[in-house]
Amino acid sequence: MAEIAKLRESIESLSAQLGQRDARIAELERLLDESRRSGKRQAAPFSKASPVEEPAKPGRKRGDAHGRHGHRMAPVGPIDRELSAPLPSCCPDCGGELELERTAEQFQVDLPPPRPVVTRFNVDVGRCVGCGKRVQGRHAEQTSDALGAASSQVGPVAKSWAAWLHYGLGLSFQKTSALLARLGVNLTAGAISQAAQSTSTALVPVENSIVAAVNGSKMIVPDESGWRVGGESAWLWAAATTRATCYWVADGRGFDQACQVVSPEFGGVMVRDGWAPYRRFDKATHQTCLAHLLRRCDELISDLPAWARSTPRRVRELLSEALDARNLDDAERAVVVADLAERVELLADDAHPHDENRKLVAHLYAEREALFTFLAHPDVDATNWRAEQAIRPAVVNRKVWGGNRTWRGAETQGRMMSVLRTAAQQRVDAIDFLTRLARAPTPADVPPLFT
């Protein structure tokens, strides 16, 4: 009896130790996952591997055996200046007389010294003889009817450049102000912000046309990323299509926030990651991002013990076969889809060691109707790369200057980014578009963005 009691005591002790270790393992896995996610949010991602001890010398190798060596072509068009570089009076080595053999050409393309253009509008002011109403003239290049104390203004080209530098290239308002000052235009950071808000108001009809184009598309690719408004957490959303992209900042990342732009009645194809609120667009045909699933498989293969790696390997193999099937004809793809769908069902029925594997398989099964849409519709993307590319510049901007101070600024942020990104997709010069917008005397004269 004493021996049995001792064994029971030993078993209880070991069970307690195993319980503590299981809890510790779960905590370490949570910290690892949190660390991995945090690493993706850093301004400077960590390197993928240790530096090579003897890296290859940068640049192209010399000689014709290493392919064509590119060079800058001579400029086409009129030459603005011609300068001569005559021979020196004598040989710099021995002092001997020099004989001219030929005159060669060298070209240099450079920026001219910055000089702002100052325009004075001579505005005629009159009064109607019949009703006494005051009337004044307006030139096509004017952006305002203000006279008197408000008669000196910064023109639309400079303001459009400022908007493009801040919302398009990610310069802060302060740096944008400094750059414009170097070009001869004095515009404070506050004035740039106010000008952007004024432009944003004029862009409401343009934004509405972008939203309509997004919802009228056959395929929408949405994504969201963390944002800041007034130092508080918010979310930047993007909905990308082949023709237009819409951005908006919201106070959350749920279904209601997504519906601020994407209609809940959208009936096209939605290519998105596995975030659950996207599934509530029940009128849409869904395609979940396979790249996210493959990355998760790679993480599990790297993190899990050897005895638990078979499940993520099976999932990775299944998804890789699906991607490889894109080059097959319609009939062959249909056969592959049926086979892969059956394998997903079998995978869900199997027992899987380790909680993380069970989570992976449960998620895969929940997404089973959205795994292989791209094989049934070849014009559908298999990943949400469009949205990730669309949202990446904004993420860089957030890491540079932190987000927006006010919700009005956040509204301007989304609207300006939508116009700039869509203009690029439409091959429209964004600066020229914003300039023409500023000069439009009425909303009816706003230039079209879509070609």
Spans of model-derived segments:
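Short, flexible loop/hinge motifs at secondary-structure junctions
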Residues: 1-150, 222
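Catalytic center-proximal scaffold of phosphoryl-transfer enzymes
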Residues: 16-19, 88, 121-127, 132-451
